[in-house]
C-alpha cells in the first residue's frame, strides 16, 4: 500500500526590508537634503530587485510622507515605503528642505556735514524669483560721526505696521547673511574744508554808518555739529570783547549765542572796512571753524584842516594907523574825521614860515590849537589902505602817510588902514629985532 503525503508549496512575498528573512536583495535608494526653491520637492524612491529590475510604484510598493508640505522648510520629512503585491516589508527614508542662503547688503557712504541726514541704499540677493518682500534701509547719520546703515526686512510671516500677509517670501525658508554698511559724516578735510557758515555765523546791524569811536555789536551763533555733546569755545580777535566764550555740554545740533563788541578805529576808517573773525573749537577734536563778518558801512575817510585868523584887541571896524600893532590869533582846527600829524601852520605876513612856522605833533578830530601873532602897520599898508593877512598849513595825510596832502582851508583876515594924507607944512618967521 502506497501512502502519499502531499506537500504544500508556499510562495511568500519578498521583503524589501534587509532585516527580514525574506529579503532577497531589493534595494531602496536614499534621498539627499535639498535647498528651498519655492517648488514642490517631493522625493520619490527608486526600488529595484536583486536582479536590478525596477519595481513599480503603487504595484510593488507604496510611498507615504509624514508631512504634506514638501515645498517649504518644515524640518525632517519621513518617507515610508511599504511593499505591495508580491512584496512586503517596510522601510523608511528621511530628508529635509534646507533654507536658501540670502544676502542682505546695505551700502556705506561718507560725506561732509551739511545739516541734512546722510542715508544710503541696500539690496537683497537670493530670494526666489516671484516671491515678494518688504525692504528698506533705515540708517541715518546727520551729525559728525558714524553709525551702521541699518535696514528693515518684512517677510510674509512678519507683522510690521500692519503689513502681515502683504508679502509671500517666508523668513523660515531662508538663511540670512548680513553685510552692513557704515554711514560717516565728517567735519571736512584740509583739501575740502567744511563751509564754516554751517557751524558759525556772525552778523551786525548793517542799517547804520559807523564812524571812529562807534561801537559795533556782533551777534555770534555756533552750532554743535557732532553726534555727542560738546563744550564750545569761542575766540575773538584782539580788541573784540565777548560777553561769553565757553559753553559746556551743548547737545548735538544745538546752537549757542554770544555777543561781541568792537570800537571802530581811525585805521578802520582809512581801510574802509573792518573784518571780524571768530574761531570756534569743540572739546575732544582738533577741528577749528572761523566765522567772518565784514563791516563796510564805515564813513568815508575825510582828513581836513581849517585855519582861521582873527584880529584881537580892537573893536570891529577899527582903522589902524601907521606904526600901530595889529594882534592876531591863528587857529588850526581839525574838522575832518582822522587825526592829523606833523601839522605846520605858516603866516607869511608875520614871518612865521619855514623854520619859524608853528608846528603841532598831532591834532585829533574836532581839536583846535591857537597861536598869537602881531604885526606893525607899515607905510606900504597905509598906501594900500588895508592889511591882508593869510595863514595856511600842511599835515600828513593819514590815508597816505607818504604824501602830506591833507586838504587845508587857509585863513585870511583883512583890516582897514587910515587913508593916506601926505602933506608938508612950511612955517616962515622973521627976526624983527634987527
PLM ranges: what are they?
Residues 1-194, 210-211, 218, 262-264, ...:
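Solvent-exposed beta-strand/loop surfaces, strongest in extracytoplasmic domains of secreted
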Residues 192-434:
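Exported/extracytosolic protein signature
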Amino acid at each position: 500500500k502506497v501512502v502519499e503525503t502531499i506537500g504544500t508549496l508556499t510562495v511568500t512575498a519578498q521583503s524589501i526590508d534587509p532585516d527580514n528573512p525574506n529579503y532577497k536583495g531589493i534595494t531602496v535608494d536614499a534621498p539627499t537634503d535639498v535647498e528651498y526653491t519655492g517648488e514642490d520637492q517631493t522625493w520619490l524612491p527608486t526600488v529595484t530587485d536583486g536582479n536590478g529590475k525596477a519595481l513599480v510604484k503603487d504595484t510593488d510598493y507604496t510611498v507615504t510622507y509624514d508631512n504634506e508640505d514638501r515645498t517649504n522648510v518644515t524640518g525632517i520629512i519621513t518617507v515610508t515605503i511599504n511593499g505591495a503585491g508580491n512584496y512586503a516589508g517596510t522601510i523608511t527614508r528621511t530628508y529635509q528642505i534646507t533654507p536658501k542662503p540670502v544676502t542682505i547688503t546695505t551700502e556705506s557712504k561718507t560725506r561732509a556735514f551739511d545739516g541734512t541726514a546722510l542715508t544710503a541704499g541696500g539690496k537683497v540677493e537670493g530670494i526666489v524669483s516671484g516671491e515678494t518682500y518688504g525692504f528698506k534701509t533705515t540708517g541715518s547719520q546727520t551729525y559728525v560721526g558714524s553709525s551702521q546703515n541699518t535696514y528693515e526686512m518684512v517677510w510674509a510671516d512678519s507683522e510690521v505696521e500692519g503689513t502681515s500677509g502683504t508679502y509671500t517670501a517666508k523668513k523660515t525658508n531662508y538663511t540670512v547673511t548680513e553685510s552692513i554698511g557704515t554711514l560717516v559724516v565728517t567735519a571736512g578735510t584740509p583739501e575740502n574744508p567744511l563751509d564754516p557758515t554751517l557751524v558759525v555765523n556772525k552778523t551786525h546791524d548793517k542799517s547804520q554808518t559807523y564812524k571812529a569811536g562807534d561801537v559795533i555789536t556782533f551777534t555770534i551763533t555756533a552750532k554743535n555739529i557732532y553726534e555727542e555733546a560738546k563744550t564750545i569755545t569761542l575766540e575773538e580777535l584782539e580788541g573784540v570783547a565777548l560777553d561769553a566764550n565757553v559753553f559746556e555740554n551743548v547737545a548735538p545740533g544745538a546752537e549757542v549765542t554770544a555777543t561781541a563788541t568792537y570800537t571802530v578805529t581811525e585805521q578802520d576808517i582809512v581801510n574802509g572796512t573792518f573784518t571780524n573773525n571768530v574761531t570756534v573749537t569743540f572739546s575732544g577734536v582738533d577741528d577749528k571753524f572761523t566765522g567772518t563778518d565784514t563791516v563796510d558801512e564805515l564813513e568815508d575817510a575825510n582828513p581836513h584842516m581849517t585855519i582861521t585868523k582873527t584880529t584881537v584887541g580892537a573893536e570891529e571896524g577899527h582903522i589902524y594907523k601907521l606904526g600901530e600893532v595889529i594882534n592876531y590869533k591863528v587857529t588850526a582846527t581839525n574838522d575832518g574825521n582822522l587825526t592829523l600829524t606833523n601839522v605846520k601852520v605858516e603866516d607869511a605876513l608875520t614871518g612865521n614860515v619855514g623854520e619859524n612856522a608853528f608846528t603841532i605833533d598831532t591834532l585829533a578830530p574836532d581839536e583846535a590849537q591857537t597861536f598869537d601873532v602881531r604885526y606893525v602897520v607899515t607905510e606900504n599898508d597905509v598906501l594900500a589902505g588895508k592889511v591882508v593877512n593869510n595863514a595856511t598849513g600842511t599835515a600828513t595825510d593819514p590815508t597816505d602817510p607818504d604824501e602830506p596832502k591833507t586838504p587845508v582851508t587857509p585863513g585870511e583876515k583883512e583890516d582897514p588902514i587910515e587913508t593916506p594924507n601926505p602933506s608938508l607944512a612950511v612955517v616962515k618967521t622973521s627976526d624983527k629985532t634987527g
